[in-house]
Structures are given as C-alpha cells and as structure tokens.
C-alpha cells in the first residue's frame, strides 16, 4: 500500500566540519510531506532551509558533514546512502530546482545532452525513448521550439528559459517529491509568476509533493498548504498557511510577518527585525535563540530555555513557551493572509 507521506524527516541534525570540529547547522528537524501537498519553508538567510533540502537530496560531502536522524523518501531511508545508492533515488524519487540555473547547469554541455544525462542515470524510460521524452519535457515546461533549444548552451538562453530547463531536468523521471530552492529569486516579477504557476501545474498533474524554500511571504500565502518557519537551524513554528498567517505565535514568525510590507501595514514605518541570525559558532541550542535579538526581551531570553515543538492547536506546532510572553512594545500585529 502506498504511503500517504512521501517524506518523513525525524530528529534530523546536520553538522559541518569547521576548523577541525563539527558544528551543527540544523538541529532536531521533524517534518513530513503528503503527496499533493505544498510545504513552504521560510526564514532569513542562514536559517538552515537549504541545508535541510540538500540533506534530503543527499548532496552533502560525507567527509565534511555529519547527518543524524531519519529521512524517509517513500519509506526508504536516505541518511547513510552515498554514491550509486543515493544516485538511484536522486532524480527518480526526488528532483530539485536550484536557485541559480546558470551555475546549476553545465556551461559546456548542450541542453538536450543535460536532460539526456538525467534520463540515462535511471531506468524509468528506455534509451530509444530519450529523444521523444526530451522534447516532451521541453514542451511541458513551456519552451518554444524544443528542436532548437536542445542544441543550445545555457548561456544562450534567458534566465526564465534556463529555469524552465532546470524544471525539465528535475521532473525528467517523474519524481514524487520536487524541492524548489528559491526558484524565482533571480527572475523578474512576470517570469516569477510563470515559473511558480508551472511548478504548481506539474505538482497537480502528478500529485507530487513540493517543498518550496523561499523568503517571499507573498508567494507563501498564495501557493502553500503548510508553512514551516526555521530560525538558526531549528523549526520554530509549523501550521497550515491560513492558521500561520492569521494566528502566528512564535516571536520570530510574528516578526517576519510584521516586517513584510503590505497594504494593511498599521504604521508608515517598516518594521526591521533587530540584529542578525547567529553564526554557527554562536548558536547554543539549549537557549531561546531568537529572543536574544529582541532588545526588550533580552532579560527574558536568559530565563527561557529551548524546548521541543508543542502542538498548541490542531496541527499548529510552536517551539518553547516564549510566545506566551512576547509582545511588540508599541502595538499588536494586525492583518493576515492576503
């Protein structure tokens, strides 16, 4: 019987070797994803979003990285797999759309050859169908004149076209999970909308699960089913998109939403979150990591320890108890999902 969850991550931690010792970049991550669900992972740069995604893909250097916990892809354990055993999963069960296609694509290989390379790694399609499959993929992602594009190099295409090629490669072998890591960052607004629509169209056709890594809360409000908020390598809140936008609890989630400009912004002054995400050497996972950034909560931060995620209402999880005491000094957050 096919499992409802395409992804189940439990107590996942990733540590990088830095100056001879391992330092945790993400810690104790629990996430699951159903088939057909869009999960958005949000947070500032340095929060650990991409580190988690590359752990799912098995892209970390095993000599410089320690990964613990469990990551099940379609009930198959990923952690511990390397080489050919991981390559058989990557591309067939999970595909990834990277942030910058110009660096992700091989500049010395023609587009058709790069898609063919992905098909050749797996046995999903026989070799005599490679050519027709390549044209089918390019047409599916909205690239005009595929016969011309297969013989072009990445630098000969626009940014939007390169990202469409990346999507074609990611879905070449019909994976059940698609990871989109900031897929529209380098594109203009019009092309951004087209790329997001394309990803969602493919997701619905295949009933695939999608992990969308982004800092754009407007995009999250439009496309996500569930939102996971990360800060300094930890999950701090997880809920349905409606619940999170209408009833945010964790101080970091509330700060992110308040710093996002909208027509409903209460004040003319744009709220700025004080400070920055701590470096790996500064992180103490037994402390509440965000409160130390909030000037009016620093005294409270010394008293509050980091705790496990707690379900405060149906499928709404929040880390620790600090949210019960946190308030902005001037006013309550107003507004919700656009």
UniProtKB/Swiss-Prot annotation:
GO terms for biological process: peptide transport; protein transport. It comes from Lactococcus lactis subsp. lactis (strain IL1403) (Streptococcus lactis). Part of the ABC transporter complex OppABCDF involved in the uptake of oligopeptides. Probably responsible for energy coupling to the transport system. Essential for uptake of peptides larger than three amino acids and for growth in milk. It catalyses: a [peptide](out) + ATP + H2O = a [peptide](in) + ADP + phosphate + H(+). The complex is composed of two ATP-binding proteins (OppD and OppF), two transmembrane proteins (OppB and OppC) and a solute-binding protein (OppA). It is found in: Cell membrane. PANTHER family: DIPEPTIDE TRANSPORT ATP-BINDING PROTEIN DPPD, OLIGOPEPTIDE TRANSPORT ATP-BINDING PROTEIN APPD. Belongs to the ABC transporter superfamily. GO terms for molecular function: ATP binding; ATP hydrolysis activity. It is an enzyme of class 7 (translocase). GO terms for cellular component: plasma membrane. Its EC number is 7.4.2.6. Residues 7-257 form the ABC transporter domain. Signal peptide: none annotated. This is Oligopeptide transport ATP-binding protein OppD. Keywords: ATP-binding, Cell membrane, Membrane, Nucleotide-binding, Peptide transport, Protein transport, Translocase, Transport. ATP binds at residues 43-50. It is a peripheral membrane protein.
């Amino acid at each position: 019987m096919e499992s409802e969850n395409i992804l189940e991550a439990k107590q996942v931690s990733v540590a990088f070797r830095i100056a001879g010792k391992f330092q945790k970049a993400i810690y104790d991550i629990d996430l699951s994803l159903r088939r057909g669900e869009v999960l958005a992972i949000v947070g500032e740069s340095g929060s650990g979003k991409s580190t988690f995604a590359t752990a799912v893909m098995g892209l970390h250097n095993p000599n410089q990285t320690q990964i613990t916990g469990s990551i099940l892809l379609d009930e198959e354990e990923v952690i511990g797999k390397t080489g050919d055993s991981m390559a058989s999963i990557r591309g067939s069960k999970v595909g990834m759309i990277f942030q910058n296609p110009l660096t992700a694509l091989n500049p010395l290989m023609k587009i058709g050859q790069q898609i063919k390379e992905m098909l050749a790694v797996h046995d999903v399609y026989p070799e005599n169908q490679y050519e027709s499959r390549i044209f089918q993929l390019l047409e599916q992602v909205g690239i005009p004149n595929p016969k011309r594009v297969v013989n072009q190099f990445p630098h000969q295409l626009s940014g939007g076209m390169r990202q469409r090629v990346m999507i074609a490669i990611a879905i070449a072998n019909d994976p059940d999970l698609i990871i989109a890591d900031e897929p529209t960052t380098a594109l203009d607004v019009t092309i951004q909308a087209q790329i997001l629509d394309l990803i969602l169209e493919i997701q619905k056709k295949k009933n695939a699960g999608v992990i969308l890594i982004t800092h754009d809360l407007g995009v999250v409000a439009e496309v996500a089913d569930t939102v996971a908020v990360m800060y300094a390598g930890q999950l701090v809140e997880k809920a349905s998109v409606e619940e999170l936008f209408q009833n945010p609890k964790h101080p970091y989630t509330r700060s992110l939403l308040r710093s996002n400009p909208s027509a409903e912004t209460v004040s003319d002054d744009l709220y700025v979150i004080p400070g920055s995400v701590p470096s790996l050497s500064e992180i103490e996972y037994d402390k509440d990591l965000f409160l130390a950034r909030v000037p009016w909560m620093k005294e409270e931060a010394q008293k509050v320890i980091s705790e496990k995620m707690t379900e405060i209402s149906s499928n709404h999880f929040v880390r620790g108890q600090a949210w019960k005491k946190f308030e902005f000094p001037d006013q309550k957050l107003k507004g919700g999902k656009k």
